[in-house]
UniProtKB/Swiss-Prot annotation:
NCBIfam families, per database record: TIGR01440 family protein
Similarity section: Belongs to the UPF0340 family.
SUPFAM superfamilies from the UniProt entry: TTHA0583/YokD-like (SSF110710)
Disulfide bond annotation, renumbered to this chain: none
Provenance organism: Bacillus cereus (strain ATCC 14579 / DSM 31 / CCUG 7414 / JCM 2152 / NBRC 15305 / NCIMB 9373 / NCTC 2599 / NRRL B-3711)
Domain of life: Bacteria
InterPro entries in the cross-refs: Antibiotic_NAT-like, DUF436
Protein name: UPF0340 protein BC_5317
């Protein structure tokens, strides 16, 4: 089995397992950070390839077709971890568009591949995603809504890269009288 086939299979299994637990809904935003270098067993930012990026991108697009989610592809630190999204997503969610063209050496392989393969790509600096996947310890947390909840899947690595996933939930706010599940006894002020 080739490395690319293995990466595709691991990603498919990971996304399937994640969706079983997270139940993402159509229109929710799923952020992906990925070091293709780490997938290949190399240090982040040193050996990324468009071949690995294409494999990951195509599996993520299939996941999008199955679930109706919106994808956001995190670029590398040289672009301050900005994100590639479809223009319609940026407009719908009122993300501020910035001017830059990701390239492998400043954007990373996956961000660059996404920029050249989405229908109408733009780059945005900030989003608050509903869920996400981090392949190779790229740190997607800055792009997740509060509160991030880790989701454990059976897949711990994509290729040689450590993989973590998270969904989000609304904050539980209030004090001693706060209630988090509606029950009949909560209809009075006492």
């Amino acid at each position: 089995m080739t490395e690319i086939v293995k990466v595709r299979e691991q990603l498919q299994m990971s996304l399937s397992d994640f969706q079983e637990q997270a139940s993402l809904q159509s229109g929710q935003i799923f952020v992906v950070g990925c070091s293709t270098s780490e997938v290949l067993g190399e240090r982040i930012g040193t050996s990324g390839t468009m071949e690995v990026a294409e494999a990951i991108f195509s599996e993520l697009k299939q996941f999008q077709e199955q679930t109706g989610i919106e994808l956001a592809f995190q670029c590398c630190e040289h672009l301050n971890r900005a994100l590639v999204v479809e223009r319609e997503v940026a407009i719908k969610y009122q993300f501020e568009i910035v001017t830059v063209t990701p390239v492998r050496s400043a954007g990373g392989a996956l961000g660059t591949y996404a920029y050249h393969n989405l229908k109408d790509p733009v780059v945005v600096e900030f989003i608050k995603a509903d869920a996400g996947m981090d392949i190779g310890d790229t740190f997607i947390g800055m792009h997740l809504k509060h509160v991030a909840v880790p989701v454990r899947t059976n897949v711990k690595e994509i290729g040689s890269a450590h993989v973590t996933m998270a969904k989000t939930r609304g904050k539980l706010i209030g004090g001693a009288r706060a209630v988090y599940a509606a029950v009949e006894e909560t209809t009075t002020c006492r």
